[in-house]
Amino acid sequence: YGGNSKKGFDCSGFTQYIMRHHGYNLPRTAQSQGDTYSKIKSSEARKGDLVFFGSSKKNISHVGIVSSEKGSSISMIHASSSKGIMISNIENNSYWTPKIQYYARVVKD
């Protein structure tokens, strides 16, 4: 944990970096980012929202940024420890879907 440069992001370092460049200061860890923002339903998720993964709502281990338009299959951009920055489809995905705990909105209308 702790990577937050262009050469070595971890997931929450990546979300923190991207959001900072849009004027939002996120906490450092995935868990603290999830604890900070208002939860939303998956059906309300839109580009720019955060999606949190883990074994429970109190044990968040990964975060990504929704990169798909509302109404389309949900995808995220995120930092993978093994593959770097990537886009992954998380809807009906055998790896990601079971781990989704919640979505949260940082950028208000």
Residue map of PLM features:
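Catalytic cysteine-centered active-site loop
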Residues: Y1-K47
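Short, Lys/Arg- and Gly-enriched loop/turn segments at beta-strand edges
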Residues: K58-I65
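Short beta->alpha junction loops/turns
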Residues: N4, S56-K57
